[in-house]
Amino acid sequence: MDHLKRQDEKVFAAIEAELGRQRSKIELIASENFVSEAVMEAQGSVLTNKYAEGYPGKRYYGGCEHVDVVEDIARDRVKEIFGAEHVNVQPHSGAQANMAVYFTILEQGDTVLGMNLSHGGHLTHGSPVNFSGVQYNFVEYGVDAESHRINYDDVLAKAKEHKPKLIVAGASAYPRVIDFKRFREIADEVGAYLMVDMAHIAGLVAAGLHPNPVPHAHFVTTTTHKTLRGPRGGMILCEEQFAKQIDKSIFPGIQGGPLMHVIAAKAVAFGEALQDDFKTYAQNIINNANRLAEGLQKEGLTLVSGGTDNHLILIDVRNLEITGKVAEHVLDEVGITVNKNTIPFETASPFVTSGVRIGTAAVTSRGFGLEEMDEIASLIAYTLKNHENEAALEEARKRVEALTSKFPMYTDL
């Protein structure tokens, strides 16, 4: 970044500081990952200069012959990975992908069944502070009070009672496998559309390690980062019968020109997901998550649902007599990055919370394995149990530094 360093020292310094943070801390935020240098090169390419409103072969600007190739590559690779009939890779985010689906099939005020945010859902699944909860009549389903798993009989009962036009499956903080086939059966029984938001598990689905929602859902949305390990962005997969409507909802419906440099980075990441070693990577994510969950439980920590089937773990910190906010802060102080998170049947404010959400996608990309998961479990428990003991926190910092120093990253940057 020699040009940036010479031209804008302040921005360069901030980027360098962030690189230092990523190198020196243990990244456990479940929605984050580390992309390859190839993905970063594509996103930082000259494609950032190109406007390309429309779709390949049907643009509103000239000079799009090369970006058309890039977008076609991205779409074709997604079809190959997930078996989708139609793909739109233009959404700037998962939220905009969800918005486009809603705009395609819903009218303002229509009833939708979605997962309660504190039970593991997402803001765009009907939260009253989000456009989805403002524009549509969302009815919530959740998890069982004891098992903390989705109660499909309850979902069916609510679907029969409220007759939603759309059912939304998928989550942002649910550590268990979701039965998409069952969701489709419920949707069919009440004559509803089914949309699956697989943002968190897309990489696991791509590797064949989590059930694929594409054969069951009318629409599948996802981000392109998280476990899929691409750039930050979104996409929509749908049945061919909805292709024209979905494309129209994205452009000109809710977006203008697509970000072609990001789509190029998406294409590169999708190519990586098609390689044999990506399945090994995804399996390691799951193995690491299971080992980390076991280690946390051995340390006496409480896990929502008692464990995990994917990359994500939700820790209930109430038995430690602290809040999620305190836990996030003290872990960050020693070099472990997490996020506070609500838990099912939450009683605390979303700005405080009773839980912490962690995930293993990023540390697995860095090369951490089972032994490192044991050390991380020990570190988390040690830090939280000694959150007011500065000597203990200093010891934890040294242990974090010793661990991260064994796994250098982005050494060419």
From Swiss-Prot:
<comment type="function">
    <text>Catalyzes the reversible interconversion of serine and glycine with tetrahydrofolate (THF) serving as the one-carbon carrier. This reaction serves as the major source of one-carbon groups required for the biosynthesis of purines, thymidylate, methionine, and other important biomolecules. Also exhibits THF-independent aldolase activity toward beta-hydroxyamino acids, producing glycine and aldehydes, via a retro-aldol mechanism.</text>
</comment>
<dbReference type="GO" id="GO:0035999">
    <property type="term" value="P:tetrahydrofolate interconversion"/>
</dbReference>
<comment type="subunit">
    <text>Homodimer.</text>
</comment>
<keyword id="KW-0028">Amino-acid biosynthesis</keyword>
<dbReference type="GO" id="GO:0004372">
    <property type="term" value="F:glycine hydroxymethyltransferase activity"/>
</dbReference>
<dbReference type="GO" id="GO:0005829">
    <property type="term" value="C:cytosol"/>
</dbReference>
<dbReference type="InterPro" id="IPR039429">
    <property type="entry name" value="SHMT-like_dom"/>
</dbReference>
<dbReference type="GO" id="GO:0019264">
    <property type="term" value="P:glycine biosynthetic process from serine"/>
</dbReference>
<feature type="site" description="Plays an important role in substrate specificity">
    <location>
        <position position="225"/>
    </location>
</feature>
<feature type="binding site">
    <location>
        <position position="239"/>
    </location>
    <ligand>
        <name>(6S)-5,6,7,8-tetrahydrofolate</name>
    </ligand>
</feature>
<keyword id="KW-0808">Transferase</keyword>
<dbReference type="InterPro" id="IPR019798">
    <property type="entry name" value="Ser_HO-MeTrfase_PLP_BS"/>
</dbReference>
<feature type="modified residue" description="N6-(pyridoxal phosphate)lysine">
    <location>
        <position position="226"/>
    </location>
</feature>
<dbReference type="Pfam" id="PF00464">
    <property type="entry name" value="SHMT"/>
</dbReference>
<keyword id="KW-0963">Cytoplasm</keyword>
<dbReference type="InterPro" id="IPR049943">
    <property type="entry name" value="Ser_HO-MeTrfase-like"/>
</dbReference>
<dbReference type="InterPro" id="IPR015421">
    <property type="entry name" value="PyrdxlP-dep_Trfase_major"/>
</dbReference>
<feature type="binding site">
    <location>
        <begin position="349"/>
        <end position="351"/>
    </location>
    <ligand>
        <name>(6S)-5,6,7,8-tetrahydrofolate</name>
    </ligand>
</feature>
<dbReference type="GO" id="GO:0030170">
    <property type="term" value="F:pyridoxal phosphate binding"/>
</dbReference>
<feature type="binding site">
    <location>
        <position position="117"/>
    </location>
    <ligand>
        <name>(6S)-5,6,7,8-tetrahydrofolate</name>
    </ligand>
</feature>
<dbReference type="InterPro" id="IPR001085">
    <property type="entry name" value="Ser_HO-MeTrfase"/>
</dbReference>
<comment type="similarity">
    <text>Belongs to the SHMT family.</text>
</comment>
<keyword id="KW-0663">Pyridoxal phosphate</keyword>
<protein>
    <recommendedName>
        <fullName>Serine hydroxymethyltransferase</fullName>
        <ecNumber>2.1.2.1</ecNumber>
    </recommendedName>
</protein>
<dbReference type="InterPro" id="IPR015424">
    <property type="entry name" value="PyrdxlP-dep_Trfase"/>
</dbReference>
<comment type="pathway">
    <text>One-carbon metabolism; tetrahydrofolate interconversion.</text>
</comment>
<keyword id="KW-0554">One-carbon metabolism</keyword>
<dbReference type="InterPro" id="IPR015422">
    <property type="entry name" value="PyrdxlP-dep_Trfase_small"/>
</dbReference>
<feature type="binding site">
    <location>
        <begin position="121"/>
        <end position="123"/>
    </location>
    <ligand>
        <name>(6S)-5,6,7,8-tetrahydrofolate</name>
    </ligand>
</feature>
<comment type="pathway">
    <text>Amino-acid biosynthesis; glycine biosynthesis; glycine from L-serine: step 1/1.</text>
</comment>
